[in-house]
Amino acid sequence: MGLKEDFEEHAEKVKKLTASPSNEDLLILYGLYKQATVGPVTTSRPGMFSMKERAKWDAWKAVEGKSTDEAMSDYITKVKQLLEAEASSASA
């Protein structure tokens, strides 16, 4: 399986987590996903009254230097960590 297919598979797996990831984890995933699928940020930073959009933009901007492959790989790693954490908490 290629990196792109693995990435797409993990993008689906993350939707099936029974417990919602923390906001921090969601922002990390968002930034990596956008970097992997869109590339570097091309929009201006949202205003201070759009806190949610601003946080998402900041998360994307934070990974701006990563290549598509790096972002995909990091996204897969993060999803695996979340899946493992969920599995270990379910078995505990």
Swiss-Prot record:
<protein>
    <recommendedName>
        <fullName>Acyl-CoA-binding protein</fullName>
    </recommendedName>
</protein>
<dbReference type="InterPro" id="IPR035984">
    <property type="entry name" value="Acyl-CoA-binding_sf"/>
</dbReference>
<feature type="binding site">
    <location>
        <position position="56"/>
    </location>
    <ligand>
        <name>an acyl-CoA</name>
    </ligand>
</feature>
<dbReference type="InterPro" id="IPR014352">
    <property type="entry name" value="FERM/acyl-CoA-bd_prot_sf"/>
</dbReference>
<comment type="function">
    <text>Binds medium- and long-chain acyl-CoA esters with very high affinity and may function as an intracellular carrier of acyl-CoA esters.</text>
</comment>
<comment type="similarity">
    <text>Belongs to the ACBP family.</text>
</comment>
<dbReference type="InterPro" id="IPR022408">
    <property type="entry name" value="Acyl-CoA-binding_prot_CS"/>
</dbReference>
<feature type="binding site">
    <location>
        <position position="75"/>
    </location>
    <ligand>
        <name>an acyl-CoA</name>
    </ligand>
</feature>
<feature type="binding site">
    <location>
        <begin position="30"/>
        <end position="34"/>
    </location>
    <ligand>
        <name>an acyl-CoA</name>
    </ligand>
</feature>
<feature type="domain" description="ACB">
    <location>
        <begin position="3"/>
        <end position="88"/>
    </location>
</feature>
<keyword id="KW-0446">Lipid-binding</keyword>
<keyword id="KW-0813">Transport</keyword>
<dbReference type="Pfam" id="PF00887">
    <property type="entry name" value="ACBP"/>
</dbReference>
<dbReference type="GO" id="GO:0000062">
    <property type="term" value="F:fatty-acyl-CoA binding"/>
</dbReference>
<dbReference type="InterPro" id="IPR000582">
    <property type="entry name" value="Acyl-CoA-binding_protein"/>
</dbReference>
